Amino acid sequence: MNNTPFTIAQMRPIREAMTISRPARLGAEVPVTWFSMGAGTSITPESYDCITLYLGAEGSGCFVLGAEARHVPLAPGELLVLPSKTLCGTLADSDGTGMIYTEIILKKEQFTMNNIIKAGQPTALKDLISYEEGSIANLDIVHADNMKFVLMAFDEGTGLTPHRAPGNAILTALEGKAIIGYEGRDYELNAGESFRFDKNGLHSVTPQGKFKMSLLLVIE
């Protein structure tokens, strides 16, 4: 994958009548997979013996949860957290263009989940964190010794100077836009777009006004 702005729809486009998955290859110990589903397609319910996170990216559809087959819609920009051993299938709306989402499997037994997250209830990520005057706000959603998923809100005039991270990461713009500096080049990142940082890649974030983002970091 090139280190340039992208959308998950570009990395894993929807194909009519097909369900397709593609690994993001952030790290073997934290499987991150992009799924695209054609309109009206479905994935048979299954369960994992660990916590699973789902991030809506594009289109419309729902997750089918539990033995009672409860239908839970997931919209772009929303997070759905499922406890271990939760039976889960997916169904793309038949009257739409399809559905694209990200799956993150937390294989580690020891991790910390923010108690503002309610399992089985979709939550808009950008609504979980507020802007703080003249400041950069951080909100850890979940972290373990080999990963972190965090939200950040930048007030106007703030930003991150060039630095390096100890693992591969994907930044996703949730609101506003920013200039991403990466290894000496600048890229504009708009809401709904993502950017990959490789381990130890030199990067910076310069918001163009107020800006919210998520960051998924995998350390191996």
PLM features: residue spans?
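Short, conserved beta-strand element in jelly-roll/cupin
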Residues: 36, 47-63, 152-155, 164-179
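Short acidic-glycine-tyrosine-enriched beta hairpin
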Residues: 68-84, 183-200
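A short, N-terminal "cap"/entry segment at the start of jelly-roll beta-barrel domains
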Residues: 1-31, 75-76, 80, 94-146
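Conserved short histidine dyad/triad with adjacent acidic residue
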Residues: 16-20, 31-48, 134-138, 147-165, ...
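Ligand-binding loop in jelly-roll beta-barrel domains
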Residues: 84-110, 199-220
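Surface-exposed loop/turn positions
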Residues: 28, 41, 78, 86, ...
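Short strand-coil-strand connectors
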Residues: 28, 66-68, 181-185, 208
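Ordered, small/hydrophobic-rich secondary-structure cores
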Residues: 1-89
